[in-house]
């Protein structure tokens, strides 16, 4: 459960992302594909090269979904229900991949905002991303 301090930390950190959520999402996806090559199997039709339009497009979707989650932290299940259905029933993404992407998102955020990425902010973002992952995998059960 996210504490009020966690929610404030997440909102403050995400505000630094600004209009670059899609870029951060694409960068995190690229990191994931490079660091965890098995994740590429979910994107056989994508050009996974650096800067590809398809990775940027999916990164934008990731960024938009996270922005929605940040704006609806008190109702993540409601805010992410459609996305949860998509990943569970249609795409059938292995739940571990959400943890891998979450890790890559943390690294991306830390690289772009090293001064603001304190241990407390890191912990809050980690809890937030774990909550998002839990919601996205909740319909697998």
Curated annotation (Swiss-Prot):
The keyword Metal-binding applies. Coiled coil: none annotated. Keywords: Heme, Iron, Metal-binding, Oxygen transport, Transport. CDD domains: Hb-alpha-like (cd08927). PROSITE patterns: GLOBIN. GO terms for molecular function: haptoglobin binding; heme binding; iron ion binding; organic acid binding; oxygen binding; oxygen carrier activity; peroxidase activity. The keyword Secreted does not apply. Red blood cells. Transmembrane segments: none annotated. Disulfide bonds: none annotated. Residues 1-141 form the Globin domain. O2 binds at residue 58. One of its GO terms (cellular component) is hemoglobin complex. InterPro entries: Globin (IPR000971), Globin-like_sf (IPR009050), Globin/Proto (IPR012292), Hemoglobin_a-typ (IPR002338), Hemoglobin_oxygen_transport (IPR050056), Hemoglobin_pi (IPR002339). Heme b binds at residue 87. One of its GO terms (biological process) is hydrogen peroxide catabolic process. It comes from the Eukaryota. Heterotetramer of two alpha chains and two beta chains. Involved in oxygen transport from the lung to the various peripheral tissues. Belongs to the globin family. This is Hemoglobin subunit alpha-1.
